[in-house]
UniProtKB/Swiss-Prot annotation:
GO terms for biological process: innate immune response. GO terms for molecular function: ubiquitin protein ligase activity; zinc ion binding. PROSITE patterns: B302_SPRY (PS50188), ZF_BBOX (PS50119), ZF_RING_1 (PS00518), ZF_RING_2 (PS50089). Interacts with IFNAR1; this interaction prevents association of IFNAR1 with TYK2. This is Tripartite motif-containing protein 10. A zinc finger (B box-type) spans 94-135. Residues 142-245 form a coiled coil. Belongs to the TRIM/RBCC family. A zinc finger (RING-type) spans 16-61. InterPro entries: B30.2/SPRY (IPR001870), B30.2/SPRY_sf (IPR043136), Butyrophylin_SPRY (IPR003879), ConA-like_dom_sf (IPR013320), PRY (IPR006574), SPRY_dom (IPR003877), TRIM/RBCC (IPR050143), TRIM10_RING-HC (IPR042784).
Length: 489
């Protein structure tokens, strides 16, 4: 069955161009256009054309002969069929609003049974005690509920789309970082390859020199040994001949002969001199600098591939009056004695904390904090957002713009939404703090053993600053962009 929309579209195609209604007794003129017979007759009467000039088509303005329009029976049949389709389509629409049980039009809605009712259904005993409303009245609250659901769904969809966009940005940042690291590795290993080739040539030259010295000593040794063997052969032949002579000849000069044999001492030549042997034994030590260079190279490459060392200093404008800063602003010590400091807006007045200068709005940065806690003391390390609360109580958790860990006497805690005591192999004395702004990571690790401590995941939208908190008489910390930061003396 044709839909109402398709029937309406088809009916528009058989409208009269004059009256804009459905063609009645359609007739065709010379140009091929169709009109109602009555409409075309009236058109000819109104225009009253000059007998010398033929009338023109109302649609295309082509002239036609007034007595030459003819009935279009085929089009008339099409119009009749379309009229029937329109009627059937209307009946189908009406049937949708009819009660299937009683054949009456549906006007009501039972909220208890969630049923659509006609007048007869409305008066039935099973619905008399129910809440029954007109369809439009009943639909109103449901429309409102649907609207609320739509608002919630759209909001959740926007949140998911925002998450998708943010995560896609993070992925792109990571891909960019990987590409950069690839180039870094290629470049560094190209330099390493050149360095190794140079070192290889140096070591091979040294080995070649040792080889030449050994061969030289071998030749000298062969000459010396050959000479000694020749002298011994001569003496042996002389004695063998002496031994076979008669007694009178044997005893002639026998004493000098024996003395010459007894005083003859064999010089025991050495093929490899002690000095050359020591050079051979010492050769592996020539590779030690190479091993050290390799270790330093790998450590440097690993560090540079991770983060850019941040050369930070403490900001005295933010320091709590109980914190004593060094002149170079690289160290801080807790003191119960209040320092004379102006109460400017940037300064913490209750939390014994201090920020670093500068802050970050992007990139990957790292710094090391050496911590020396007195008994019962604590030190808080991390990053905070630019608008962190400076006056009054400071709640240290991510919701307040604080991503930090706290080192206390004997334990370490992550200051997440609910502080979490961490299990570590050892209490860190030096902590590496690292931030990847675009990816949203704040990472803590033992700067000596490289043991991971904790990682926060965040979404930074404004500048963040390195953050430090300190408590306990005698507790102190110092800063460094590299490992091995010195503690306060």
């Amino acid at each position: 069955m044709a839909s109402a929309a398709s029937v309406t579209s088809l009916a528009d195609e058989v409208n009269c161009p004059v009256c804009q209604g459905t063609l009645r007794e359609p007739v065709t003129i010379d140009c091929g256009h169709n009109f109602c017979r009555v409409c075309l007759t009236r058109y000819l009467e109104i225009t009253s054309p000059d007998p010398e000039e033929p009338p023109t088509c109302p649609l295309c303005k082509e002239p036609f002969r007034p007595g030459n329009f003819r009935p279009n029976w085929q089009l008339a049949n099409v119009v009749e069929n379309i009229e029937r389709l329109k009627l059937v389509s209307q009946m189908d629409l009406d049937e949708e609003d009819v009660c299937p049980e009683h054949g009456e039009k549906v006007y009501f809605f039972c909220e208890d049974d969630e049923m659509q009712l006609c007048v007869v259904c409305r008066e039935a005993w099973e619905h008399r005690a129910h809440t029954v409303r007109f369809l439009e009245d009943a639909a109103g609250p449901y429309r409102e509920q649907i609207q609320k659901c739509l608002e919630c769904l759209r909001k959740e969809r926007e949140e998911i789309q925002e998450i998708q966009s943010r995560e896609n940005r993070r992925i792109q940042v990571l891909l960019t970082q990987v590409a950069t690291k690839k180039q870094k590795v290629i470049s560094e290993f190209a330099h390493l390859s050149q360095f190794l080739e140079e070192q290889q040539n140096i070591l091979l030259d040294q080995l070649e020199k040792l080889d030449e010295d050994i061969l030289k000593h071998r030749d000298e040794f062969d000459v010396l040994v050959t000479g000694e063997i020749g002298r011994f052969n001569t003496l042996i032949e002389e004695l063998e001949e002496k031994k076979e002579r008669p007694a009178r000849e044997l005893l002639t000069d026998i004493r000098s002969t024996l003395i010459r044999c007894e005083t003859r001492r064999c010089r025991k030549p050495v093929a490899i001199s002690p000095e050359l042997g020591q050079r051979i034994r010492d050769f592996p030590q020539q590779a030690f600098p190479l091993q050290r260079e390799m270790k330093m190279f790998l450590e440097k490459l690993s560090f540079e591939l991770d983060y850019e060392p941040a050369h930070i200093s403490l900001d005295p404008r933010t320091s709590h009056p109980k914190l004593l800063l060094s002149e170079d602003y690289q160290q801080a010590r807790f003191s119960y004695k209040w320092q004379k400091s102006p109460d400017n807006p940037q300064r913490f007045d209750r939390a014994t904390c201090v920020l670093a200068h500068g802050g970050f709005t992007g990139g990957r940065h790292t710094w090391v904090v050496s911590v020396d806690l007195a008994h019962g003391g604590s030190c808080t390390l991390g990053v905070v957002s630019k608008d962190i609360r400076r006056k009054g109580e400071l709640r240290m958790r991510p919701e307040e713009g604080v991503w930090a860990v706290r080192l206390a006497w004997g334990f370490v805690s992550a200051l997440s939404s609910f502080p979490t005591r961490l299990t570590l192999e050892e209490q860190p004395q030096q902590v590496r703090v690292s931030i990847d702004y675009e990816v949203g990571w704040v990472t803590f690790a033992n700067a000596v053993t490289q043991e991971p401590i904790y990682t926060f995941t965040a979404s930074f939208t404004q500048k963040v600053f390195p953050f430090f908190g300190l408590w306990g008489r005698g507790s102190k910390f110092s800063l460094s962009s590299q490992e091995g930061a010195a503690t306060l003396s």
